[in-house]
Regions:
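N-terminal Rossmann-like dinucleotide-binding module
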Residues: 1-33
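Beta-loop-alpha module in the N-terminal Rossmann-like domain of NAD(P)-dependent dehydrogenases
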Residues: 6, 36-93
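Short, Asp-centered acidic motifs that coordinate Mg2+ and/or phosphate
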Residues: 20, 52-53, 126
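C-terminal helix-rich "cap/oligomerization" subdomain common to oxidoreductases
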Residues: 53-56, 250-292
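A contiguous active-site-proximal alpha/beta segment in oxidoreductase catalytic domains
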Residues: 61, 83-136
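Hydrophobic residues in well-ordered beta-strands that form the structural core
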Residues: 79-80, 102, 215
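Contiguous beta-strand/loop segments that form the cofactor/metal-binding neighborhood of enzyme cores
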Residues: 149-221, 243-255, 292
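Active-site loop of classical SDR/Rossmann-like NAD(P)-dependent oxidoreductases
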Residues: 215, 234-246, 261
Length: 292
């Protein structure tokens, strides 16, 4: 994620510069960011005092620990998804000061922003989400299952689009390749399918209570594959991260942000993921508790 996402994106963000990276294996630092100061841990990087803000893209089990270190140093912090290892740690993350931000980068897709603008805050809607793609990269340390690797973006997307909290989840399918979910919202419902496939598919459809199409997009595989090969192409991963990092800079300077999620958003997302696991085991609907 850092090598293929954040580092290319950072080069396009005005007023930002990569000054340090951390990894237990220093050779990886030198490969992805040659000439940049390298440290063996987030703690070493933070204690060196080289940075004005930090992106935490460590394994989820380390997110809370590293975010607390960054918070103690007063650093604006962006935590990659999943926000934490579980709901309890997500709640603790939301208590860190200054409040960390969360890398739900799908919010910065211009098509998603356009669709969200068409949905009134009190609307009852039905969302259909269908997102499949081949594996884009291989993590060094962790091998998250689909609920951890894909679930955070998709649950957040449902919440953010509809401005409505998730109340319960039913898992219709959960395999190593595909997840299918039915989601009940305070105002409406959603159907989500996501996972791995031989070709790309990115489709979102939003309808009102009468069944009328409000907005969405449908990007077939060949078009999406070509678009994402364009450096800085519209809605490429790097471009989504540019928007996210620009928001982080605004936040660091005390200015209003465009769409950046906070650690408070991470709590209901992790709660929905845990509910999906409960439902997968029971075959029944699972409630999503409210923690804030």
């Amino acid at each position: 994620m850092v090598e293929l996402g954040y580092i290319p994106a950072l080069k396009k963000v005005r007023g930002a510069q990569l000054v340090a990276v951390a990894d237990p294996v220093l050779e990886r630092c030198n490969r992805v960011a040659p000439g940049v100061r390298a440290y063996r841990s987030a703690q070493e990087l933070i204690e060196a005092g080289d940075v004005d803000a930090i992106v935490i893209a460590t394994p989820a089990a380390a997110h809370l620990h590293d975010a607390r270190l960054a918070g103690a140093a007063g650093l604006p912090t962006l935590v990659e998804k999943p926000p934490a290892a579980n709901v309890a740690e997500a709640i603790a993350l939301a208590q860190v000061s200054p409040l960390p931000w969360i890398g739900f980068n799908r919010r910065f897709d211009s098509r998603v922003e356009t669709t969200r603008a068409k949905i009134a805050s009190d609307s009852v809607v039905e969302v259909s989400l269908d997102r499949f793609h081949p594996g884009a990269w291989t993590p060094y340390v962790v091998r998250d299952d689909l609920l951890d690797s894909h679930g955070p973006h998709n649950f957040d997307l449902i919440r953010w689009l509809t401005r409505s909290e998730i109340t319960r989840v039913r898992t219709l399918e959960l395999t190593s390749q595909s997840v299918s979910l039915e989601v009940e919202l305070e105002r409406g419902r959603a159907f989500a399918r996501f996972g791995h496939a031989t070709s790309f598919r990115d489709s979102i459809e939003v309808r009102n209570a009468a069944g009328t199409l409000i907005g969405g997009h449908d990007t077939p595989g060949l078009f999406l594959r070509a678009a994402r090969r364009i450096v800085g192409g519209v809605n490429s991963l790097a471009q989504l991260l540019v928007g996210e990092l620009e928001d982080l800079i605004e936040a660091a300077n005390g200015r209003p942000v465009r769409s950046l999620a906070t650690a408070h958003d991470g709590v209901p997302v992790m709660a929905a993921i845990e509910a999906a696991r409960v439902s997968a085991a029971s075959g029944e609907w699972a409630p999503v508790p409210r923690y804030n």
